[in-house]
Curated annotation (Swiss-Prot):
It is an enzyme of class 2 (transferase). Keywords: Cell inner membrane, Cell membrane, Membrane, Transferase, Transmembrane, Transmembrane helix. Pathway: Protein modification; lipoprotein biosynthesis (diacylglyceryl transfer). PROSITE patterns: LGT (PS01311). One of its GO terms (molecular function) is phosphatidylglycerol-prolipoprotein diacylglyceryl transferase activity. GO terms for biological process: lipoprotein biosynthetic process. Its EC number is 2.5.1.145. It holds the Pfam family LGT. The chain crosses the membrane at residues 21-41, 53-73, 95-115, 122-142, 182-202, 215-235, 247-267. Its main location: membrane. A 1,2-diacyl-sn-glycero-3-phospho-(1'-sn-glycerol) binds at R143. This is Phosphatidylglycerol--prolipoprotein diacylglyceryl transferase. Disulfide bonds: none annotated.
Length: 289
């Protein structure tokens, strides 16, 4: 019922700034990213207990991920939109103005996670499996930053859940259109459902209802997120392009292939990774998950 009510709303951004105190300002985008990181640490710490990973290590990992993911997300975006920054290189650092790419964040975060895992001598797949639910949750939260910045929206629409875009934020091709697909909302809901699915799979594995192996949740994330992104990206008006191809869709297709091949490798070829999920311990609180 709540989702139905939400979809009946017309969305209008109040602006990118939450509050201004003299020369200082707090922007919605930064607040949402910070909230996503904190909630992600909490969730992954709970999951880590069942993967024989020190929960305290998750906070350390989060620092590595932020250092790796956010600059990579920005540089990925700038690389494909260089014409916007060539004459204003200082604007590259103005990340609070928007303009980051999740695929860049995933690449940078993955590199940071691999380095962290090697330094801590922790199996990589154990770490990725406890991180991906938090990643999906963080994406669900972070997409609302696009709403406040009036960016990353879709094509014009008259649907009840349409999004109003100020004239100075509209593409020239749609300058006369006022309302657009709220693709931020589509992806936010998709990622939230993906997060819930991953947590459900984790719980089923703990209860030995599913033969969950290390790496499976990572593969499911790659497939699930990418399927949604291919659909949603087709609606957007500001896609990063390589010629006539949408880069996010191409990367998503590659990610799906990796996810499917990973599942085949784990289960189909009988070369599975170790089953590192501990079964639920009698008397242990299930609320930990």
């Amino acid at each position: 019922m709540a989702i139905v009510t939400l979809l009946a709303l017309q969305f209008t951004s109040p602006g990118p700034t939450l509050v201004e105190i003299g020369p200082l300002s707090i922007r919605w985008y930064g607040l949402l990213i910070a909230s996503a990181v904190l909630l992600g640490i909490s969730l992954s710490s709970r999951l880590a207990r069942r993967r024989d990973i020190d929960p305290n290590a998750i906070a350390d990992l989060a620092v590595w991920l932020v250092i790796g993911a956010i600059p990579a997300a920005r540089l990925y975006y700038v690389a494909f939109e260089w014409q916007q920054y060539a004459s204003r290189p200082a604007e590259i650092l103005a990340i609070w103005h928007g303009g980051i790419a999740i695929h860049g964040a995933i690449l940078g975060g993955t590199a940071a996670l691999i380095l962290f895992a090697r330094r801590r001598q922790t199996p990589i797949w154990q770490l990725t499996d406890v991180v991906v639910p938090s990643l999906a949750l963080g994406q669900a939260i972070g997409r609302w930053g696009n709403f406040f910045n009036s960016e990353a929206f879709g094509t014009p629409t008259d649907l009840p859940w349409k999004l109003f875009i100020p004239i100075d934020r509209r593409p020239l091709a749609y300058i006369q259109s006022e309302y657009f697909h709220p693709t931020f909302l589509y992806e936010s809901l998709w990622n939230l459902l993906l997060c819930l699915l991953l947590i459900w799979l984790f719980r089923q594995g703990l209860r030995q209802r599913l033969p969950l192996k290390a790496g499976v949740m990572t593969c499911i994330y790659l497939i699930g997120y990418s399927l949604g992104r291919i659909w949603i990206e087709g609606l957007r008006t500001d896609s990063l392009m390589l010629g006539s191809l949408r880069i996010a869709q191409m990367v998503s297709i590659v990610a799906i292939a990796f996810g499917v091949l990973g599942l085949v490798w784990i289960y189909g070829l009988k070369r599975s990774l170790p089953d590192v999920v501990r079964p639920a311990i009698s008397g242990e609180s299930r609320s930990e998950l």
